[in-house]
Amino acid sequence: MSMNHIRPWRNIERRKSRQIHVGNVPVGGDAPIAVQTMTNTLTTDIKGTIAQVQAAADAGADIVRVSVPDEASARALKEIVRESPVPIVADIHFHYKRGIEAAEAGAACLRINPGNIGDEKRVAEVIKAARDHNCSIRIGVNAGSLEKHLLEKYGEPCPDAMVESGLDHIKILQDHDFHEFKISVKASDVFMSAAAYQMLADATDAPIHLGITEAGGLMSGTIKSAIGLGQLLWMGIGDTLRVSLSADPVEEVKVGFEILKSLGLRHRGVNIISCPSCARQGFDVIKTVETLEERLEHIKTPMSLSIIGCVVNGPGEALMTDVGFTGGGAGSGMVYLAGKASHKMSNDQMIDHIVEEVEKKAAALDAQAAEDMKAAE
C-alpha cells in the first residue's frame, strides 16, 4: 500500500496530457509511463528482428521501434508486426512513402522527423495513411537534424528551435484534424534536452516521449539518461520513454524500468537494495548481489529485497523490504521476512534460500492480486 500520504516528499504530480493509443498501449493521461526500445538489427533480417523484439518484450518493453529505411524493410515490417507481442513503431526518415508503406504493413505508430520528412503536402499523405490504418504518429524532433530555416533563425541547435519545430508540426497534424500523436524533442546534451522538454510541456497537452538521444555506451548512456530523464520525470513530465544506449536493446529496457522504479513511477520485478560493502561485511556482498540479480530476473512481481553486509544499516533497511538478509558473524546472517527478523541462515546456503523466499513471496503477492481482482469484478 502507498504511504505517500504521510510522505509528501515522495509525491510526483504528473503533467496532465491527452491520452492516445499506440496499438493496445495507452499513452498519456493517467496511463502508466510506457517503456520503449528500438531494434538494432537489419529490418530485412526478419528472424533476427523478431527475436530482438521478443527479447525486449520479455524484459518488459511496452513498445518497440523498428527502422524502415527502404522498401525492402517496409515489406519485412508486415511479418515483424504480425509476430510481435508488442506494438511496433516504424521509424521514418527522409522518405515519406516509407511511412505510408509502414502504416499499410500494420505499424501501430509512425515516428516522423520534422527535419527530414519533407513539406506539408508529404506530411499530409502520411497523416492520411495513419488515419486509414488506425496508426498514431510521433513527432520526433532531434537537435541533430533540425530544419534549415530554424538553424538559420537561431544560429545553432537550441531548445527554442527544437520546440518551434515540434509545435509547427503539431499545427500541421491538427490542421488535418489528426490528434492521435505524441511528441519528443531529443538532444544528446542533457541541458538542452531538459530545457526543451520543459518548454514543450508548457506549450502543449500532447503526450510526451522522453529520451536523451545518442546518449552513449551502457555506463555513460545510463548516467546521462538517468540525470536527464530522471529530473523531467520528477517534475511530472513524460508519458513514455526510451533510454538510448549503444548496447543491447534489452539493456535499454532494464535501465528504463530502473529509472521509473527509483522514482516510484512503475514497479516491475525485484528491487534489490544493497550496500557497497566494506571491511565490516559478513559475506561477499558484491558477488551475492550479482548472482541474485541473475537468478531473480524471472520474477516480474514488484517486490523489494535488501542485501546488507553488516548490522550497521542491515536491520533498518530490512524493516522496509519484503525479504532481507543482513550479515552477522560466524559465517551466518539474519533473514528478514516482511520487515521482521525471522531466522538465521549460513552464508553458503543463503543465495539459494533467498531465491526460494523471494519466489514464495512473489507467488503470495500474485495470488493476493488475483483474489483482489476477482473480488472487484
Swiss-Prot record:
Reactions catalysed: (2E)-4-hydroxy-3-methylbut-2-enyl diphosphate + oxidized [flavodoxin] + H2O + 2 H(+) = 2-C-methyl-D-erythritol 2,4-cyclic diphosphate + reduced [flavodoxin]
Pathway listed: Isoprenoid biosynthesis; isopentenyl diphosphate biosynthesis via DXP pathway; isopentenyl diphosphate from 1-deoxy-D-xylulose 5-phosphate: step 5/6
HAMAP family, per the entry: IspG
Protein family membership: Belongs to the IspG family.
This protein's name: 4-hydroxy-3-methylbut-2-en-1-yl diphosphate synthase (flavodoxin)
Binding residues for [4Fe-4S] cluster: C275, C278, C310, E317
Keyword Lipid biosynthesis: no
